[in-house]
Amino acid sequence: MFPTDPVSNLAALIRCPSVTPAEGGALAALEAMLAPVGFKVDRVVAKEPGTPDIENLYARTGGEGPHLMFAGHTDVVPVGDEAAWSRPPFSAAIAEGEMYGRGAVDMKGGIACFVAAVARHIEKHGAPKGSISFLITGDEEGPAINGTVKLLEWAAARGERWDACLVGEPTNPDCIGDMIKIGRRGSLSGRITVHGVQGHAAYPHLADNPVRSILQIAQALMDPPFDDGTENFQPSNLEVTTIDVGNTAVNVIPAKASAAFNIRFNDRWTAESLMAEIVARLDRAAAGSALRPGRAPARYEIVWNERPSHVFLTRNNALIDSLSGAVEAVTGRQPQLSTTGGTSDARFIKDYCPVVEFGLVGKTMHMVDERVALADLETLTGIYETFIARWFGHAAA
């Protein structure tokens, strides 16, 4: 039986407790949907010392011609306090036209809809005029070490090549059809430690308080603004996310203080140029402090996150036009082409082929009582089905 009903597909996926890193039966359920449609399915276990093994899935159907990939994840975030849920988080309960469950929106719902869309397309038109593949990880909500990155490497090593990719993350703020993500800002994180001299709070002249310096350094990182945005991206923004001293004694000046930060940056910067700008700001703040009269520059060190995410923008007109045209045909809305929000696994896929993102409404993702309207599942399936037909029509032209 073809899995043409997104509601049934989603219920089967939600009932699998696939909290990262557990597979929870979700990939097995997905494989059971794809096999009857003619997909060859591979389950790929990725490993890395010091991290949990992660099971992933790659499936492909079709033959020669353009190759369209759908990417996503079956892993979900923890449910939190289960007693706070109005319905069990892995029950796929339906009430008042909505299905409840962890992953309903992020992003088992998107997977369920694309499976249904592909099944409907093949049922109506036969095999695609090319190939369709699913690249599904169990490690998106976690550290993302043994997930999409390694699955892409595995598939590419086998000779897989893709012409375009659609990621089914929830991209719409309010209604299906609001927004398509055509790129993402970069993300860079670091931790700064300022070293001082420990001493008695009553004798500050005998000590060197690093808290004074870390506060000034934190301010220098955030102000002035890094830029005022670009044509396709909002202004780069740095947030200091924590300041830590680890000192419980109120009469002791600490020996060191640290601060962590994250910056989301636009295409005016690379990770490397941004690092240089941040270090220049740190040097100026450390050297010229009115809070440190008569003292040497503050001594600091910075440790960068090992894996910055690079900014990217997709300019593939056939892909974007096929998707935006499908959205408008089904919903009547002209979607906004956006680069807002956080990072996703599209940041890895962009190194292999053009990629865009479109899925459900994200209002309840990661929340207690995460849920999706059944009508939205049908609408998204219709958009995906229309997109498949339009994209293969463009690609074959």
From Swiss-Prot:
Q: In which pathway does it act?
A: Amino-acid biosynthesis; L-lysine biosynthesis via DAP pathway; LL-2,6-diaminopimelate from (S)-tetrahydrodipicolinate (succinylase route): step 3/3
User: Which residues are recorded as binding Zn(2+) 1?
Assistant: H73, D106, E169
Report the SUPFAM superfamilies cross-referenced here: Bacterial exopeptidase dimerisation domain (SSF55031), Zn-dependent exopeptidases (SSF53187)
What biological-process GO terms show up in the record? diaminopimelate biosynthetic process; L-arginine biosynthetic process; lysine biosynthetic process via diaminopimelate
Tell me the keywords, alphabetical order.
Answer: Amino-acid biosynthesis, Cobalt, Diaminopimelate biosynthesis, Hydrolase, Lysine biosynthesis, Metal-binding, Zinc
| Cofactors, names only | Zn(2+); Co(2+)
Enumerate the InterPro entries for this protein: ArgE/DapE_CS, Bact_exopeptidase_dim_dom, DapE_proteobac, Peptidase_M20, Peptidase_M20_dimer, Peptidase_M20A
Its domain of life reads Bacteria
Q: Which GO terms describe its molecular function?
A: acetylornithine deacetylase activity; cobalt ion binding; succinyl-diaminopimelate desuccinylase activity; zinc ion binding
Name assigned to this protein: Succinyl-diaminopimelate desuccinylase
Organism field: Rhizobium meliloti (strain 1021)
Q: Which gene encodes it?
A: dapE
